[in-house]
Amino acid sequence: MVLNYIWIAFFVIAFVIAVVKLLFMGDFEVFPAMMDSTFASSKTAFEISLGLTGVLSLWLGIMKIGEKGGVVNALARLLSPVFVRLFPEIPKGHPVTGSIFMNIAANMLGLDNAATPLGLKAMEQLQDLNKKKDTASNPMIMFLVLNTSGLTLIPVSIMVYRAQMGAAQPTDIFVPILLATFFSTLAGIIITSLYQRINLFNLTMLLTLGGACVLVSAIIWGFSQMDKDQVNIVSTTVANILLMLIIIGFILSGVRHKVNVYDAFIEGAKDGFQTAVRIIPYLVAILVGIGVFRASGAMDMLIDGIKWTVAAVGGDTDFVGALPTALMKPLSGSGARGMMVDAMTTYGADSFIGRLSCVFQGSTDTTFYILAVYFGSVGIRYTRHAVACGLLADLAGILSAIAICYMFF
């Protein structure tokens, strides 16, 4: 519903601005430019979708091997000591804990098709424990915030788009996304725990969160000692090594569990073509809307206004061109994806804005969409502090993404 209003606004605002330009500024080129943008954007959307097929097939095949090889179960077992303490109101041994762990693990691996059904199942089980059926319980809210913070280990789709848009090193945003999504998730956990008065000062949580913070701090300190060329070389090398280790690990896990690895890969890869075809209408819709909005001059007005505000308080304005992706992400995943593609098309996949828009896309998730789907599935009407916690986690992800990208790029 939100995306519907945004899409309408793209056209209405663009039309109003174009009429003003025509009548009061004598700009006879604005309407031809807007119409040309609709054709160019439609063509771009189709070409991008077509080009995604091969890389999508590759990674969906690899993910299927990991899924059948028990990687999700292994990750769920690894996470269980931490998440048990984040959900103190859930009775020990209740089946919902398994669904929560599996959902978070699937999200971390980028297995959206598996994560959503597991998430809906977890929400139904949490509703069974909920005493006020129309009001979100504390475990529900913590679960939602963990989903909206966008914690991910493998940002496959973003790397795929970067490859299609001609990035020299599509994986160069891998480490920045890991760092930004860590801060987003950490902020979400801390903020929600403060609301719910969950004690994070126990040995397990201190060791886990403290250890993660030390590791991330060490990574940031290490990169801060290098110049930007060294940062780019090291981060790209590390990202590619990690991704290769993930592929090898998934294959070995499949072999260990006696999975026919080749058949599993083919089964998953088949979904690549279907996924690429399925996103064509969505990508056409959002890119055409953004194209018209940009061709009318409305996007430049928006960005220039934000730049003026940032400059007025003495801030650097290099990041402003990527902000439309960050602002769209809590509202719509497809809308933010369109903004990311538009930024790479306009400024270049290897530009600072192009890279930052990709990190924005990977550091948080679609807060309002997740709230609508998960809470709507069980009839929750009163969300309590869920929206506030989710949006604050998003804000932490956005701010950390900006800081990290200045360091890396």
Regions found by a protein language model. Give the residues of each.
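Generic signal for short, ordered secondary-structure residues
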Residues: 101, 105, 140, 231-234, ...
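Hydrophobic alpha-helical context, especially transmembrane and signal-peptide helices
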Residues: 5, 33, 45, 94, ...
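Signature of multi-pass transmembrane helix bundles
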Residues: 1-54, 163-294, 312-313, 385-409
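C-terminal transmembrane helix pair
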Residues: 114-115, 122-162, 167-197, 323-409
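Membrane-embedded alpha-helical segments and adjacent helix-loop junctions characteristic
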Residues: 29-128, 257-346
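Hydrophobic alpha-helical segments, principally membrane-spanning helices and signal/leader peptides
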Residues: 36-39, 46, 95-97, 132-140, ...
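Generic hydrophobic alpha-helical membrane-segment signal
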Residues: 2, 91, 98-100, 135-140, ...
